[in-house]
């Protein structure tokens, strides 16, 4: 079967609404790509998106009158004269394969690789985390996840407990376990994240060393030598009393999900209790790390 595709440039705030509307008017599949043409796998219901510009790509049956689709998008205010869009005829393809072809093994730091489960690992002697992008955030394609993975790779985790606050797919907790941590604890507000983390941990053979909690069920007085939290700057500041209490004496803290422009305000919130390292930036994002004083 042949298809026709419309690709339009949008913003993180509008992408979801446009996607809903495209499905309403007959699109059989809507996907998002970021500015690097990397598929965005991680949307969570109601979550603020962490990326900047988003391209919305909608697939329609080849018989669809695409000029009518453009008219409807304009009528609804989803397309104006400043919005770039492109319509393309697409030959029959294995869509799933095409999507899978876009997700490649990625290296973080010296030892760590994140590999889609359907690909061969590039280095069997490396620390390989096998991951299938699911509904929960965290494949390593986002700069904030990458910054946290690189930080974990650089730590000596042997025998340590690691808390992954806002675990999403569980990628950071699982990477920590594979990098030598004794145990990891994943916490998230989203039940989907708990499920995804459990599945991914099982796939990586570390489920017996990963405890998972919904935020509301998190035990009191939990502490770890290493705490990593890749959520947004706002919640990181609000959660300062909670997150800082999770870190054991002289323990390490890694924070991301922070725009570079927000680094100063997050540092201000944490510097009373932590000796902070230099902020590391990647694209418009950054990572803040430090040690409990
Ligand atoms: C940006 S994702 C990070 C996922 C993964 N740790 C990574 O680095 O790719 C943020 C995650 O934090 C969770 N989250 C957001 N606010 C939270 C909160 N207040 N408490 C716990 N989890 C939260 C979201 O549900 C989401 O799964």
Curated annotation (Swiss-Prot):
It is found in: Cytoplasm. Keywords: Cytoplasm, Methyltransferase, S-adenosyl-L-methionine, Transferase. GO terms for cellular component: cytosol. Its EC number is 2.1.1.-. The keyword Metal-binding does not apply. S-adenosyl-L-methionine binds at residues 145, 166, 188, 230. GO terms for biological process: methylation. GO terms for molecular function: protein-lysine N-methyltransferase activity. Methylates ribosomal protein L11. This is Ribosomal protein L11 methyltransferase. The gene is prmA.
């Amino acid at each position: 079967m042949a298809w026709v595709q419309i690709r339009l440039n949008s913003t993180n705030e509008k992408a979801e609404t446009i996607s809903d509307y495209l499905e309403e008017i007959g699109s059989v599949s809507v996907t998002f790509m970021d500015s690097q043409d990397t598929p965005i796998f991680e949307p969570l219901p109601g979550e603020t998106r962490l990326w900047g510009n988003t391209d919305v790509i909608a697939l329609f049956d080849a018989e669809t009158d695409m000029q009518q689709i453009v008219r409807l998008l304009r009528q609804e205010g989803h397309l104006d004269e400043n919005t770039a869009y492109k319509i393309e005829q697409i030959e029959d393809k294995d869509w799933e394969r095409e999507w899978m072809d876009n997700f490649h093994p990625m290296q973080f730091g010296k030892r760590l690789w994140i590999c889609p489960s359907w690909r061969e690992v590039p280095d069997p002697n490396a620390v390989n985390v096998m991951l299938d992008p699911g509904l929960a955030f965290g494949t390593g394609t986002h700069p904030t996840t990458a910054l946290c993975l690189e930080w974990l790779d650089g730590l000596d985790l042997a025998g340590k407990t690691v808390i992954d606050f806002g675990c999403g797919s569980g990628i950071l907790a699982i990477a920590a376990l594979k990098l030598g941590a004794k145990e990891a604890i994943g916490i998230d507000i989203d039940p989907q994240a708990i499920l995804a983390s459990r599945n991914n941990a099982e796939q990586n053979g570390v489920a017996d060393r990963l405890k998972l909690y919904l935020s509301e069920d998190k035990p009191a007085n939990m502490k770890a030598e290493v705490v990593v939290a890749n959520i947004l700057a706002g919640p990181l500041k609000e959660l300062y009393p909670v997150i800082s209490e999770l870190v054991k004496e002289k323990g390490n803290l890694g924070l991301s999900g922070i725009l570079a422009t927000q680094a100063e305000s997050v540092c201000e919130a944490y510097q009373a209790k932590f000796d902070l390292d230099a902020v590391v930036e990647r694209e418009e994002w950054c990572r803040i790390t430090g040690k409990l004083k």
